[in-house]
Structures are given as C-alpha cells and as structure tokens.
Swiss-Prot record:
Keywords: Ribonucleoprotein, Ribosomal protein. Disulfide bonds: none annotated. The keyword Protease does not apply. GO terms for biological process: translation. It comes from Exiguobacterium sp. (strain ATCC BAA-1283 / AT1b). This is Large ribosomal subunit protein bL27. PANTHER family: LARGE RIBOSOMAL SUBUNIT PROTEIN BL27M, RIBOSOMAL PROTEIN L27. Signal peptide: none annotated. GO terms for cellular component: cytosolic large ribosomal subunit.
C-alpha cells in the first residue's frame, strides 16, 4: 500500500494590506517677510489658516487669510493687547 507523508514547511502565504503609507504635502505656511525687511506693495507677508496674526497698518487680508502689503515700506511685527499679534507696513520717508 502506498503511504503519503505530506509535510508543509514554513512559507509566506497571504499578504495583508496596510492603512498607512501616505502623507499630505506641506502647505508652506508662516512668515514670508521678517521684521525690519523692506517690501513692495502686494508682497505676501504671512501665510496662515485663520487669523493667527492680524493685519495692521497698510496690510490687507486675502480670502485665505494671507496677509499682504498695501504700500511699499518696512515690515513690523507688533503685539496687539495681551494675546494677539499684528503685522504692519510703515512707508519709508
């Protein structure tokens, strides 16, 4: 009579899937011009989500809360009360 002796050795059988392995690209937010730097009108000063920094003198706020210079001048970051900050642009005389 024929007798079969089947032996299965360790091997990789099935491969599962993972839910990791992806990341979003950075949005490059933050200060684009430093305090004391000279800027021209229309220059982006600060990119942000929400109003982390508020617009001050001669500074406008875009639809995505980006702060930009309205006039040529020098950038100044200032405190606005106890807990707020603002950025202003003062024209050079």
């Amino acid at each position: 009579m024929l007798q079969l002796n089947l032996q299965f050795f360790a091997s990789k059988k099935g491969v599962g899937s993972t839910k990791n392995g992806r990341d979003s690209i950075s949005k490059r937010l933050g200060a684009k011009r430093a305090d004391g730097q000279t800027v021209s009108a229309g220059s982006i000063l600060y990119r942000q989500r929400g109003t982390k920094i508020h617009p001050g003198e001669n500074v406008g706020r875009g639809g995505d809360d980006t702060l930009f210079a309205k006039v040529d001048g020098v950038v100044r970051y200032e405190r606005l009360g106890r807990d707020k900050k603002q950025v202003s642009v003062y024209p050079v005389a």
